[in-house]
Amino acid sequence: MAILFITEYAEEQIGPAGRVGQMGLEPPIAEQIVTFTSSSQSSAFNSKTRFVRLHTDTNCFLVFGTNPTAVTNTSGRLAQNQTEYRGVPLNASFKVAVTT
């Protein structure tokens, strides 16, 4: 069974002189694991989530929304062992759907 790892972040790291780093401020506010073969949805993201880190162990297709359904070859694609960051709207009850 394929796995999508989701890490939710509310803030980015702020470095010296107020410079924003391109990494999430640890600890994350939530983490999810979604197992899938056909289209499967995550739970709704935390209301404070601003961006998510996605990592998959297999080639997959994904889409975001309040009630998303991922479709092979038409939704966004992640390659096996790829890690990706995506911004999401605050307080939108967004989820990610994923399929092989």
Model-identified regions with their sequence ranges:
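Short linear motifs in intrinsically disordered
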Residues: 43, 53-54
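Hydrophobic beta-strand residues in large extracellular and virion-surface proteins
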Residues: 4-6, 34, 54, 62, ...
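Noncatalytic modules at the cell exterior or secretory-pathway interfaces
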Residues: 49-52, 87-100
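Short tyrosine-centred short linear motifs in exposed loops/low-complexity segments
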Residues: 38, 60, 92-94
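Short, intrinsically disordered N-terminal pre-domain segments
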Residues: 1-28, 99-100
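Surface-exposed ligand/attachment interfaces on beta-rich extracellular proteins
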Residues: 18-48
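Short, solvent-exposed S/T- and G/P-enriched segments that are highly enriched in secreted/extracellular
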Residues: 36-41, 72-89
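Short, surface-exposed beta-strand/strand-loop-strand elements in extracellular ectodomains
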Residues: 55-73
